[in-house]
Amino acid sequence: MAKEKFERNKPHVNVGTIGHVDHGKTTLTAAISAVLTKVHGGEVKDFAQIDNAPEERERGITINTSHIEYDTEARHYAHVDCPGHADYIKNMITGAAQMDGAILVVAATDGPMPQTREHILLSRQVGVPFIIVFMNKCDVVDDEELLELVEMEVRELLSEYDFPGDDLPVIQGSALGALQGDEAWEAKIIELADALDTYIPEPERAIDGAFIMPIEDVFSISGRGTVVTGRVERGIIKIGEEVEVVGIRDTQKSTCTGVEMFRKLLDEGRAGENCGVLLRGLKREDVERGQVLCAPGSILPHTKFESEVYVLSKDEGGRHTPFFKGYRPQFYFRTTDITGAVELPEGVEMVMPGDNLKFVVELINPVAMDEGLRFAIREGGRTVGAGVVSKIMA
């Protein structure tokens, strides 16, 4: 039989498994792959392939992640699974694999454990919008009341972190049972797939958002004006539209008088494209790398924010020594480094390489930012940490 062509006709959604070590995240990932490929076709990935996750580098940090893909009735999914707890933290903070929703795996035999809580908290901090629960290992618990109790505990824990614990789907199943071909447990995997389709809304595509393009370079073209270049992060820019230049200095307004790509003139620049935008009335020295070009009023400059941060260990090429309050590294946002001072939380005296924690940063210059924006922490061009803006303060 000839290979089927990959059809881009279904909406695409990114998901991943989270939860405590040994609760069955990778087994569930393998079970989803096995059951859904049986129903909808595609390539099956087995446990060993998923568990043997390749190394990837994201913002100078090495992370092990496994990617699988599968289809449901309504959608195409890309699913990430990480082998180690540290990989999860790094993955979520760097946004290496951004999730539109997560499947929280909780073993019915254990109930919620420390990493269960930690992954829920991280999901809240880094902006994972939806969580679905898969209660695993239900085949070895024969006490109905115990299952109910565990489900109640998980729901309460999710509510504690502002997820709708009472309303979100909880599926009781057995990943191993499904992998072994037991029809009753396979049906629970199909139920999980239906929950993904119905509970996680279709994500807004980058092209539908308000226009924003981080500025990488600025040129002046005699007789035509100033051109800024960069990759459009989201939205569309059309000739004649008003734009703002935000960050580092006071916000300036301008109008787009031309868009070009590979030296060709275009009517518009779209999300994902590298292009040059010609700006009316601005001189070359008015604009610099590190600012962003955006739709008026869509993003504001800020200097103070709370962040969730992972500090690289010595083995990862990070610092060899801890840092203390008053630490002033550079924070690399999109295209530029800005110096900032770190304010450690109450009771934290020092931060060791390999730690992850929450701290407040005050930058010396404002940066265009929204909650959920990722950054790297650098010292003289070397990455020593990664973070995400969890709350804007000023």
From Swiss-Prot:
Stretches assigned to the tr-type G domain: 10-204
Location of the region described as G2 in the Swiss-Prot/TrEMBL record: 60-64
Catalysed conversion reaction: GTP + H2O = GDP + phosphate + H(+)
Pfam families for this protein: GTP_EFTU, GTP_EFTU_D2, GTP_EFTU_D3
EC number: 3.6.5.3
Xref: CDD domains: EF_Tu (cd01884), EFTU_II (cd03697), EFTU_III (cd03707)
EC supergroup of this enzyme: hydrolase
Region (G5) location: 174-176
Gene Ontology MF term list: GTP binding; GTPase activity; guanosine tetraphosphate binding; translation elongation factor activity
Primary location group: cytoplasm
Start and end residues of each stretch annotated as G1: 19-26
Subcellular location: Cytoplasm
Chain spans, region G3: 81-84
Subunit details: Monomer.
Family stated for the protein in its record: Belongs to the TRAFAC class translation factor GTPase superfamily. Classic translation factor GTPase family. EF-Tu/EF-1A subfamily.
Function, in words: GTP hydrolase that promotes the GTP-dependent binding of aminoacyl-tRNA to the A-site of ribosomes during protein biosynthesis.
Protein name per Swiss-Prot or TrEMBL: Elongation factor Tu
Gene: tuf1
